[in-house]
Amino acid sequence: MMLMRESPDDRHYTVSATGVWKKRGGIDVLRGLDMYVRRGERYGIMGTNGAGKSSLINIILGLTPPDRGTVTVFGKDMRRQGHLARARIGVVPQDDCLEQNMTPYENVMLYGRLCRMTASEARKRADQIFEKFSMMDCANRPVRLLSGGMRRLTMVARALVNDPYVIILDEATVGLDAKSRSALWQQIEASNATGATVLVISHLAEDLERMTDRIACICAGTVRAEWETAALLKALGALKILEIDHSVSPRGKELFCNHGLHVHENDGRLSAVHPSSDFALEAVLKKEAVPTTTRFATLDDIIRFPGFPWTGVGGVNGEK
């Protein structure tokens, strides 16, 4: 089923970006980007390093203005009215921005107070989150003495303390063990169930699969494609990745190209995306004695194979 791309005429957005351009170091890192996130939606953003993800998040937060275009949160233009929206946004940035000489509990309480919560409100909410994340044992130790994973959870707790309407997770699970990652997912799901809109920026397929309803792929500063997550995952199950060692089997590349496949090369290994129902090429590879590894496609492959026409997969909205 083909989906209609979101447009400025549609309503019920929490976050909208229209025609956003941003230049950094003389280079356009955002190039007329359009993105519309519905209220209560869990929206994933994926893309290679340098695709423009961090620049977009900084503009959404009102930390830097766009050169052209408009970004609104709750209908407020973040260039002019960002202060009216920021108090209801919880963000987990990539970089550690905690007060290192304060304890996790003090960091979370401070943020709650900055968001105009009363001390009792902030304390009650902090207790709930620290208990959920099993952090009570380290709640009163200086942040500088904690592991990277515990510091990361402290940043998540800080972002959630004021029950934000928008939660932005920028590689939030980096450094977390499986138990902590699961606790984070559960907490985000609980916040989303009460109406919070969630933006997930991650290079981990597991995060995007678990925490999103829709996924956008940002490439060269624009939203190249969007998918409903469930439809995309189902469609990926109908694709497979064929991999060969080019140094061992130079003939394999010729066979890939003869079948019109988009080929990705990395450290001498060639990979190509292929329909899982088509066994003709594999039969040829076997006949030619080309050692081939076969696996199902994953979300990671959308980044690995930018030349593949992913816009035809999973009811995608369409390529810009």
From Swiss-Prot:
Q: Where is it mainly found?
A: membrane
Keyword annotations from UniProtKB, A to Z:
ATP-binding, Cell inner membrane, Cell membrane, Membrane, Nodulation, Nucleotide-binding, Translocase, Transport
- Please list the residue ranges annotated as the ABC transporter domain: 15-245
> Record's superkingdom?
Bacteria
The membrane-topology field of this record reads: Peripheral membrane protein
Give the EC number(s) listed in the UniProt record: 7.6.2.-
- Which enzyme class, named as a word? translocase
Q: Name one GO cellular component term.
A: plasma membrane
Q: Which InterPro entries match?
A: AAA+_ATPase, ABC_transporter-like_ATP-bd, ABC_transporter_ATP-binding, P-loop_NTPase
* Localization per record: Cell inner membrane
A GO MF label: ATP binding
According to its UniProt entry, the function of this protein is described as: Part of the ABC transporter complex NodIJ involved in the export of the nodulation factors (Nod factors), the bacterial signal molecules that induce symbiosis and subsequent nodulation induction. Nod factors are LCO (lipo-chitin oligosaccharide), a modified beta-1,4-linked N-acetylglucosamine oligosaccharide. This subunit is responsible for energy coupling to the transport system.
Q: How does it assemble?
A: The complex is composed of two ATP-binding proteins (NodI) and two transmembrane proteins (NodJ).
Family to which this protein belongs: Belongs to the ABC transporter superfamily. Lipooligosaccharide exporter (TC 3.A.1.102) family.
What name does this protein carry? Nod factor export ATP-binding protein I
